[in-house]
C-alpha cells in the first residue's frame, strides 16, 4: 500500500527518504510506513510517497494526518524529548502562565491567542493581524521554541528573543521586558537574537503591532538531527525527537507571568538617566 502525502513544514530534503512515519485514521489508529521518495519541487508543498507495512484501502482517506514515527515523549537528564516541542511547549507555557496570571489583581486584560498554520509561514498570525483579531493597542508577547546555537544553549534559561533571521522586534516592549527581567537578580534567563528561523513577532510588527518574543532553546530543530553535520556532509540525515530543557520550560512560564505582572508598573528610567549623565559629563568634548 502506497500513499501520496503533502509535507507542510520546514525540513531539509535529505531527511525524508528512509524516514519512518505514522499515519492516523479518524479513530486515531496508527499505521507505520517508510518514505520511499520525495518530490521536493512540488507546489504548494513538498510531496512524499509512503510505503505502509500493511494495506489500508478504505481506511485512510484524504486529509488524514501523519507524523514522524518516534517513541512516546520522555524526560532524561532534565531534557524533554518529544515528537513536537515546537510549538506545543509554547502553547503549554501560555496556558500555564494564564492560569497564574488570572489569580493576580489587575490583569484581567491579559489573554492568549492561539494561531494555526505557523509552520507554513505563520499564516494564522498574518490573518489575525489583517483581520484585527487582536486590538491594535495590544502588546504581544509571542511564544516560540527556536533552534539552539552555542551562544543560546539549552538549559541556559528561557530567552527574551530580540529578533529572528528576518527582523528585530519592537524595541520599546523588548526593552521593557529586559528591564523587568534584569530586576529578577536570581532568575536564569537569556537575551538573544535567534537567527534559526522567523517567528510570528516579525509578522505582527510588520502589521503595526507592538510585539516581542519569549522562547525556548530547541534541540533537533524541526526534528532534524545534526543539522550542521548533515549540511557539511559529515553526518547522515536522520529525523529525531525535538528537545527542550524542562527547567527552561518552567522558567518560561515564570518569565511570562513576571513580565505580564510588572509591565505596567512604574520603572526607573535607568537608560535615560545614564545617557543624561554621560552627556552632562562629556558635553565639553563637543565644543
Residue spans of the language-model regions?
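N-terminal hydrophobic/helix-forming segments and targeting peptides
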Residues: 1-287
